[in-house]
Design a protein with these regions (language model features):
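Intrinsically disordered, low-complexity polyampholyte segments enriched for Lys and acidic residues
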Residues: 3, 7-10, 26, 36
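Extreme N-terminal segment that seeds HTH/winged-HTH DNA-binding domains in transcriptional regulators
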Residues: 26-47
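Compositionally biased low-complexity segments, especially N-terminal hydrophobic helices
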Residues: 3-4, 23, 254, 272
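Acidic, Ala/Val/Gly-enriched low-complexity intrinsically disordered segments
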Residues: 9-12, 19, 23-24, 31
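Cytosolic, long alpha-helical scaffolding segments
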Residues: 40-45, 50-52, 56-382
Length: 382
């Protein structure tokens, strides 16, 4: 891939160099004077046929790419006024790119360490991950990795398995599940988890708490998938549009938002777990106090997500202002906890649940701030 920065070069000899290759560009290009700087190849803009602008390609680059006269190259205009030039055959499609890696863990590594290594390869964008086991590996290691891959990796399948090797293939196309859709799904699950977690806390519902914990695993799967998407998009900017983003800078926004949603789901899970630790039904007055803090928290999260979806800076600022009241309400309930004469175990559980509500409001603020950043970007001038 070659990033082409359009500038005017004082290179009259270019037009006389028969070895150069010419590509027709039916678009307007800004140019400026300059000389060859570092790895930047400068070429003079020319016109052929009275209508098409042309610019010659560096001969070395053409040879490196194995191109010849008549081959097709793809030219993609970027928001930073540059062009990205890619040989047509090398354009990623979001399908299996054939990228393959082999993991050969040493004997002393435990299964969690091996899983972290495999996960790192998944996040790096490899489509086929081969895990070769040492002779001393126990059979349960294969089972552990197989189940973990199915649980954690979106669209993955175990395509081959033996006592010596396990092969995981990632079949999902980035275009099938673009980043905005992933965020939308994570948002929906996180909101439901928070509502159910609060209901579980107020009503001491162990079955509901277990369901919330199960949903957290789904949020984690989507989080890992979007990190994989964003990593590949940063490495290969031709994927930006394919994963549903309009600007390379959106990768940072979606990285922050996805992490915030993953942490919100984690804290909703904490609230659900704390509800299982409460020994007796909470006093109605305490339930009312908790409801005040939780209602504001839910509202802050929902407003932040709406602001992100609509690039609404006004709503985002409203959400940030409301988030400050969550801390006040939560601290107010904590200060009163001793008056309800709960058991020590129940007191600790309620306090930790209130702390999680505070953390959720803070992560919701992060989402709102990203919405404001997107709003500014939509209105900026080039």
């Amino acid at each position: 891939m070659c990033n082409y920065f359009p500038k005017r070069a004082n290179c009259a000899h270019i037009s006389r160099c028969r070895a150069q290759y010419i590509v027709a560009i039916n678009i307007s290009i800004r140019v400026s004077r300059g000389a060859k700087l570092n790895s930047v190849e400068l070429r003079k803009l020319q016109m052929t046929g009275g209508a098409s602008y042309t610019v010659s390609l560096p001969k070395d680059w053409v040879k490196e790419q194995g191109l010849k006269v008549g081959d097709v190259v793809a030219i993609m205009p970027r928001s930073d006024s540059s062009l990205t030039l890619i040989p047509h055959e090398k354009i990623p499609t979001g399908k299996n790119r054939g990228a393959e890696v082999t993991v050969s863990p040493p004997k002393e590594q435990d299964k969690e360490q091996i899983l972290r290594t495999v996960l790192a390869q998944y996040l790096a964008g490899y489509d086929i991950i081969r895990v070769r086991f040492p002779a001393s590996a126990k059979p349960d290691l294969r089972t552990y990795l197989r189940e973990a891959a199915r649980k954690m990796f979106v669209g993955s399948e175990i395509i081959e398995e033996s006592k010596d090797e396990l092969i995981v293939q990632c079949l999902s196309s980035y275009g099938d599940l673009p980043a905005p859709k992933v965020i939308s799904r994570m948002s929906l699950i996180a909101k439901l988890m928070l509502r159910d977690a609060v209901d579980s806390l107020k009503g001491r519902d162990p079955a509901l708490a277990e369901e919330i914990i199960r949903r957290d695993e789904e949020v984690d799967r989507f989080y890992l998938f979007i990190i994989r998407q964003l990593t590949m998009a940063v490495l290969n900017r031709s994927l930006i549009l394919e994963i549903g983003l309009a600007d390379p800078r959106d990768c940072l926004v979606y990285r922050v938002v996805s992490k915030s949603l993953e942490r919100i789901a984690d804290h909703a899970t904490t609230i659900a777990k704390m509800s299982a630790s409460i020994e007796n039904p909470l006093p109605p007055r305490l339930v009312d106090e908790i409801s005040k803090a939780s209602d504001i928290t839910i509202s802050v999260l929902e407003d932040s997500l709406k602001a992100l979806a609509k690039s609404d800076g006004t709503l985002a600022n409203k959400s940030i202002a409301s988030a400050e009241s969550v801390e006040r309400e939560a601290e107010n309930v904590m200060d009163k906890l001793f008056t309800f004469k709960l058991s020590p175990k129940s007191t600790v559980a309620v306090r930790l649940a209130l702390e999680s509500l505070k953390r959720i409001s803070e992560y919701s603020e992060d989402v709102a701030e990203m919405a404001i950043n997107l709003t500014a970007r939509r209105t900026e001038l080039y």
